[in-house]
Amino acid sequence: MILTKEAIVRDFLNMGLWRGEVLLVHSSMSSLGFFVEGGYDAVIDAFLEVLGDTGTLLFPALSYATVTREFPVFSLKGTPCCIGKLPEAFRKRPGVIRSLHPTHSVCAVGRLAKEITMNHGMDTTPVGPNSPFRRLYEFGGRILMLGCGLR
């Protein structure tokens, strides 16, 4: 079965996603099926279409497998994330902002992207008071587990 962006938009709306919300997505691209017409961009574009210009889309951009004690180098633009192809495709898109945390950064685009990602590097833990995770809570955001569990 070929999955189109239009079908994904319909499914997201049927799931209860809405225009203007703040949404953090954990994902497994393979859970969407054998073939998505348009690939990663179609899925990301479907999210952006549903959330609209007043929404904010976030993906974790964890790099704990790349930034290690043996190689303690982190680059906002260059360090890849290690948790999937969809978050990595999102990270590389124009206009996406990445929080400044060497191992647990978050990428965001949309109305609140800057507010959610700023000052993450000032925390002593990945989920401190300046973290995108805390700000997600403060802005009433939700987390979508797209084809993946809690492990």
Model-derived segments and their meaning:
Residues 8-24, 29-32, 102, 140-145:
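N-terminal/domain-start segments enriched in small and hydrophobic, helix-friendly residues
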Residues 5, 40-44, 83:
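Amphipathic alpha-helical segments in well-structured domains
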Residues 14-21, 49-56, 92-97, 136-142:
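Secondary-structure boundary elements
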Residues 4, 38-40, 124-128:
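Short, glycine/acidic-rich beta->alpha junctions
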Residues 67-151:
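Internal, conserved structured core segments that host functional sites
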Residues 8-10, 43-44, 128-132:
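Short alpha-helical segments and helix-capping/turn motifs at coil-helix boundaries
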Residues 1-7:
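N- or domain-start disorder-to-order transition segments that initiate the globular core
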Residues 16-71:
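N-terminal active-site beta-alpha-beta segment that forms phosphate/nucleotide-binding
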